[in-house]
């Protein structure tokens, strides 16, 4: 049985291959990368607001929106879910020390 992420990703790929005129996913593909990136930015802002408001239910919904739009971008850029999973697997379990990370100085 496939997980929800895989099913969503495959549905988005199918919309790219076989567009449906009333599909929001199709609309994003027609508008192109700039529109997709704009939506990712908007949804990330909504994640921040939901988190700052301590609204767990809204935060979950907005995170799903971010993931959906990121999946649309991955399909647009011809990056597979397997590519992402390989990178996650490679990073998983690696020892990472705070000193190995860039300083975050914009806060």
From Swiss-Prot:
Please provide an example of a Pfam family that matches this protein in its UniProt record: PRA-PH
Keyword annotations of the record: Amino-acid biosynthesis, ATP-binding, Cytoplasm, Histidine biosynthesis, Hydrolase, Nucleotide-binding
- Key word Amino-acid biosynthesis present: yes
Sorted alphabetically, which CDD domains does this protein's record hold? NTP-PPase_HisIE_like
According to its UniProt record, the EC number is 3.6.1.31
Please classify the protein's predominant subcellular localization into one broad category: cytoplasm
Q: Where does the record place it?
A: Cytoplasm
One example of the protein's molecular function in GO is: ATP binding
What GO CC annotations are associated with the protein? cytoplasm
Reaction equations catalysed: 1-(5-phospho-beta-D-ribosyl)-ATP + H2O = 1-(5-phospho-beta-D-ribosyl)-5'-AMP + diphosphate + H(+)
GO biological process entries = L-histidine biosynthetic process
* UniProt pathway: Amino-acid biosynthesis; L-histidine biosynthesis; L-histidine from 5-phospho-alpha-D-ribose 1-diphosphate: step 2/9
| Entries under InterPro entries matching the protein | HisE, PRib-ATP_PPHydrolase-like
SUPFAM superfamilies per the UniProt record, alphabetical: all-alpha NTP pyrophosphatases (SSF101386)
In the record, the note on similarity to other proteins reads: Belongs to the PRA-PH family.
Return the protein name: Phosphoribosyl-ATP pyrophosphatase
């Amino acid at each position: 049985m496939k997980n929800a992420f895989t099913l969503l990703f495959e549905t988005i790929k199918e919309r790219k291959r076989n567009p449906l005129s009333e599909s929001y996913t199709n609309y994003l593909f027609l508008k192109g990368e700039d529109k997709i990136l704009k939506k990712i930015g908007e949804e990330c802002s909504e994640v921040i607001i939901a988190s700052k408001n301590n609204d767990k239910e809204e935060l979950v919904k907005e995170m799903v929106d971010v993931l959906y739009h990121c999946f649309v971008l991955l399909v647009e850029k011809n990056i597979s879910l397997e590519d992402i999973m390989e990178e996650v697997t490679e990073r998983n379990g690696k020892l990472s020390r705070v000193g190995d990370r860039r300083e975050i100085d914009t806060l």
